[in-house]
Amino acid sequence: MKTAFPSSATAIVDLLCHRIFGIALGYEDLNDHDELRTDPGYAAIVGKSDPTGSDRSRDRDRGYALAGSSTLNRFELGSEDGSASNRYRKIVGEFSEIEELITELSLEQMALEGTPPMIFIDADATDDPLHGRQEGRFFHGYYDSYCYLPLYIFSGDYLLCAKLIPSKIDACDGVIEELKRIIPRIREKLPGVKIVFLGDSGFCREEILSWLQDEAHIDYVIDMAKNNRLLKKISAELEEAEKIYDEEGKPCRIFKGFYYMTRNSWSRYRRVIGKAEHLEKGSNPRFVLTSLVMPEYSPEMIYEELYCARGEMENRIKEQQLCLFADRTSTHWLSSNQLRVWLSGIAYILLNAMRSFALKGTEMARARCDSIRLKLFKIGALVRVSVRRVYLTMSSSYPYKTIFEMAYLNLQKIRV
């Protein structure tokens, strides 16, 4: 971010910290910052050397260490271009650099944990319902609402991409462009790692499959919509699963691997894993497409250990939207709504770093973002300000004192 015109006395880095920390602490509205700007403890966290604001140059700002909601509003409305005639767009975003920053921050965290033999890149698009007439607003038939269709890409808990997309286009549009940007960065940060792409049936497209195999040279495990030809391939297994269910009275699943090619759209035969399952409610066949081959990757392993694990990504998206307000896309402009999504993403990266490093070895090592906030961040304390320091005095009866101390010690061990 940069200031196109000197309209604010507050540095961009302060505005970034102010808003990102506010999101992490649960303050979703800019109005909340009109109260936070007078909090010396919060000002110290943001990095202000004058946490009381007594040294501000302007009389109207004196006593306020941080920016108010109007300045933050101009910050959030920042676009990719500024204009001297537009008083609300004087803070300009270098959007390509923000995208790179999100990827870089997460990859640096991954590198601190060492290079694993294999990582999974999980892509998914979700709905972001809209209740106004925002730029890029379209009706989506599947979700039965006006919405955006943000594309998220994760590797485990690590956010690599958060792209706000209008819902008038296919959910998989743009994923190749994002992967072209992300995969070289992964190979640079984690040399020698094997990369496997995971996705739902929305990503089962010839152009994506061929690009992954022929150009990116990475493997994939992708959900496939069932059809009559696929069901015929596992008809015997479905009958056997039903028979076993009738005999034993408990769910039964049988896996089968086979090679399959569509009549028109695919360029080659590809390996499909069929799951023939019978439950109380009846038959439940599923199919996934993969480039992983036997004997190292059996049908059971591919489905149960690799594909089913991608369900965790849904939890990470929930954290983005429910805990960190990535669905607060209520400004008129698509660009400023994208900026809000990125700010929520950076707040997530901050909290995930807490979870991965500070809370490692504690009972909160897998806690959700809102649980970390509630138990470790938003706690009562006495704030005292001296000439040189800001003192925080916590209650001796604070119930999570032991976890707080362990988190503090773990953070001190990190060498950046």
Question: What spans do the regions from the language model cover?
Answer:
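Basic, short loop/linker segments at the boundary and entry of helix-turn-helix/winged-helix-like folds
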Residues: 1-17, 173
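Short, conserved catalytic/metal-binding motifs centered on acidic residues
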Residues: 18-19, 33, 72-75, 117-127, ...
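Active-site-proximal, Lys/Arg-enriched surface segment
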Residues: 50-51, 55-151
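Electropositive, glycine- and tryptophan-enriched low-complexity nucleic-acid-binding patches
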Residues: 141-190
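An anionic, glycine-rich sequence signature occurring as long contiguous blocks
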Residues: 219-322, 409-416
